[in-house]
Amino acid sequence: MDRGYIYLNKKSFIHNLEVLKNLSRKELCLVVKANAYGHGLEWAVKNANASGIKWFAVASVDEGMQVKKVYKESRVLLLAEPSKIQLENIKENDIDLTVYNESFIDTLIETRDEYSVHLKIDTGMHRLGCPPEKF
């Protein structure tokens, strides 16, 4: 059986980003995990940046470093919890962290370093996140 293929149109991609930017009037964060869902991380970051997108979300530290390689001034949010040994790369590459449990907060405190963090709070979907009463 042949594989299916999707071809992305650069003009349409940028147009869609512009529509989203105009609807939200807020800074957008483009999720580019898993090689931009198979569409090519480098392609997605370059073209999104051409549209003014400066913030990208990834699933791994390696993906975050790839984004920084394509667009050094980008802001990168790591969606997954990294291992303690990855924290040095995170610090060196100025990657924001997602915090969704107390044990990871304790790990960050133990390092005595400063990190940009985003709290993921479980508001009822029961996927990931700290219960609101913890904060």
Show the residue positions of the predicted features:
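Active-site-proximal beta-alpha core segment in soluble small-molecule metabolic enzymes
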Residues: G4-Y7, K26-F135
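Positively charged, low-complexity intrinsically disordered leader regions
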Residues: M1-L23
